[in-house]
Amino acid sequence: MEVMNLIEQPIKVTEWQQTYTYDSGIHSGVNTCVPSVSSKGLLDEDDTCGRQYTLKKTTTYTQGVPQSQGDLEYQMSTTARAKRVREAMCPGVSGEDSSLLLATQVEGQTTNLQRLAEPSQLLKSAIVHLINYQDDAELATRALPELTKLLNDEDPVVVTKAAMIVNQLSKKEASRRALMGSPQLVAAVVRTMQNTSDLDTARCTTSILHNLSHHREGLLAIFKSGGIPALVRMLSSPVESVLFYAITTLHNLLLYQEGAKMAVRLADGLQKMVPLLNKNNPKFLAITTDCLQLLAYGNQESKLIILANGGPQGLVQIMRNYSYEKLLWTTSRVLKVLSVCPSNKPAIVEAGGMQALGKHLTSNSPRLVQNCLWTLRNLSDVATKQEGLENVLKILVNQLSVDDVNVLTCATGTLSNLTCNNSKNKTLVTQNSGVEALIHAILRAGDKDDITEPAVCALRHLTSRHPEAEMAQNSVRLNYGIPAIVKLLNQPNQWPLVKATIGLIRNLALCPANHAPLQEAAVIPRLVQLLVKAHQDAQRHVAAGTQQPYTDGVRMEEIVEGCTGALHILARDPMNRMEIFRLNTIPLFVQLLYSSVENIQRVAAGVLCELAQDKEAADAIDAEGASAPLMELLHSRNEGTATYAAAVLFRISEDKNPDYRKRVSVELTNSLFKHDPAAWEAAQSMIPINEPYADDMDATYRPMYSSDVPLDPLDMHMDMDGDYPMDTYSDGLRPPYPAADHMLA
């Protein structure tokens, strides 16, 4: 059949979305034929008839374009040469000869002669393929200048026909390599694609670039020819096959061509890609979302562009509505990248991202589950007030039973944040055996602070300020968690973990039944040791006039406050009170009354208030000269501090002479109790005032992302689940850790 007749036949178009897969071609190395344009005859390979194949290849150019007599003679000689080589090397390979072999075969049977001839036939076939490959390359190379000229023709009909021919050539490996080696032809294809308004021409030219993009040489040729801006322009095409060719070609460029990401960004590729999230073809969406991930990773400007174009909403919608695993995985990768962007995080959460991601935590795809877990963890610090997370919380509690380090890191971190300042979530986790699961996670974690620290923080949240807090406090003891928790106070544990553990111990001490186990675990000597060490370190900086530095994001003043506060609660028990007194702590507590930090003054006055209930301790407090600072604290702006100071003064004045007692009484009345009879009564009876108490002292924890390339630092919030306001001297942040993640390929 002649070439021009073939070209003029209607092009058979099939639904490309039914045929293409997520692999855009370069991964498998398959010489993918363009699924949307198929034509029989032109450049089709006929393995059984070498002569017919070669003749078709020859006539493609003798009739497709006007040629000189010399060209015709050249191609005829080329055809004759190939035919002579075939007949010389494989005399049985012609159409007539091969038909004889078939004619002798009995239907359904293979003769011994045919079996013996199989190796010979295979060799002949290989030689024929080799000859045909050479023919492809020679003919394509010969035709390139003329095809380039035709692509630049002013007649759109000529351009369309030339594009069809080049498209067919791009489907065969040998001719495709010849095309890649011609910068002029690739540039002509790019220009044609960019300037055409004809849909068939657009389809053919994008198909050509798609086929070339399966090879690194082709990617480089497209890039150098300015193909990226042209391909980005094609993302606005109404033809789905054109969209597919454009997005898969861009995908291959982003994956393997250096400089492609910047070129796509400069061509406003993100602005064109984000609206494509509204398409409804899962496989097309999988490639599109992977392009977004490649562009957004490590580039803050790209993340903001995605946000400005409604990307978070589109991505969450995909996670909510689709079940195609590759699409869910690629989409979760984009969300994971965006989830470390402070601007994108609230947008994802407000779009229902937490609930949409939670749907897939029970998926059979480990990589999807892991991406969802990391993304949930990253988002959880801005989702503490989100509703409808009951199922997510239950699944996270169940995930604590697995041994995978990444799963445990994500589950504990997310639970820690979602139980912060959320009484409903605390109650739900406690009622679903969350305390027991967290303790077991701590026991299995060993020295992995990325698991232990958020688990301790979550326990600290569960043991205070919600209806089931007392149940949680008892559950820690009943599940043998107290010894393991007290051991976490030992150095060289990281200071953030130590700080969180101190807060948890204070909460556990609120339950009287926990006092004996805490004492048996030697918690008081460890707290006192930490207190002395932290205070000495803080004092050195005060004496030197330098600002208190952070150690792993924790200031020593925070440790001083935490230890003193925990000892205050423990001192409510008579046995603990005696042990604290015997450790010679009163001089240090009196010293803390002079602190410039209001919170430290309060907890120091509070622990002295408890110790002063015993006469021996009260005398020791007086002997240390505590009266003067306590008198000053009567005028404190903090009512709790003033009340504790008044109670201590009242207690140590009991054995003083009448004049001293009268002076103290007048001072107390004038400064504190003039308008508050209840406070006066409390001071007289030594009943501690129900002053809210800070138990949340944790800083941000270390960002990690399962086995993925280092992403942006995770910005976790300062946990504020305490009973009194955040420390005014701490911003709750620690320097970012070195990234230790790698993107899943």
Swiss-Prot record:
Q: Subunit structure, per the record?
A: Homodimer. Component of an E-cadherin/catenin adhesion complex composed of at least E-cadherin/CDH1 and gamma-catenin/JUP, and possibly alpha-catenin/CTNNA1; the complex is located to adherens junctions. The stable association of CTNNA1 is controversial as CTNNA1 was shown not to bind to F-actin when assembled in the complex. Interacts with MUC1. Interacts with CAV1. Interacts with PTPRJ. Interacts with DSG1. Interacts with DSC1 and DSC2. Interacts with PKP2. Interacts with PKP3 (via N-terminus); the interaction is required for PKP3 localization to desmosome cell-cell junctions.
**Where would I find the ARM repeats?**
132-171, 172-215, 216-255, 258-297, 298-341, 342-381, 383-420, 423-464, 470-510, 512-551, 574-613, 615-661
Database matches in SUPFAM superfamilies:
ARM repeat (SSF48371)
Q: Where in the cell is it found?
A: Cell junction, Adherens junction; Cell junction, Desmosome; Cytoplasm, Cytoskeleton; Cell membrane
Indicate where the modification Phosphoserine is found in the sequence: 99, 125, 182, 665, 730
Could you tell me which species this protein originates from? Rattus norvegicus
What remark about domains does the record contain? The entire ARM repeats region mediates binding to CDH1/E-cadherin. The N-terminus and first three ARM repeats are sufficient for binding to DSG1. The N-terminus and first ARM repeat are sufficient for association with CTNNA1. DSC1 association requires both ends of the ARM repeat region.
Residues modified as N-acetylmethionine are 1
User: Which residue ranges are recorded for the region named Interaction with DSC1 and DSG1?
Assistant: 132-297
- Give the matching PROSITE patterns: ARM_REPEAT
Which keywords does UniProt give here? Answer: Acetylation, Cell adhesion, Cell junction, Cell membrane, Cytoplasm, Cytoskeleton, Glycoprotein, Membrane, Nucleus, Phosphoprotein, Repeat
The topology of this chain with respect to the membrane is: Peripheral membrane protein
One MF annotation (Gene Ontology) recorded for this entry: protein kinase binding
Which GO annotations describe the biological process of this protein?
A: bundle of His cell-Purkinje myocyte adhesion involved in cell communication; canonical Wnt signaling pathway; cell adhesion; cell migration; cell-cell adhesion; cellular response to indole-3-methanol; desmosome assembly; detection of mechanical stimulus
- Please identify the protein, giving its name as recorded: Junction plakoglobin
Recorded hits in Pfam families, A to Z, give: Arm
Name the tissues where it is expressed: Expressed in the heart (at protein level).
**A single GO CC term, please?**
Z disc
Which superkingdom? Answer: Eukaryota
PTM per UniProt? May be phosphorylated by FER.
Annotated region (Interaction with DSC1) at 574-661
Q: Which residues are glycosylated?
A: 14
Q: What is the lineage of its organism?
A: Eukaryota, Metazoa, Chordata, Craniata, Vertebrata
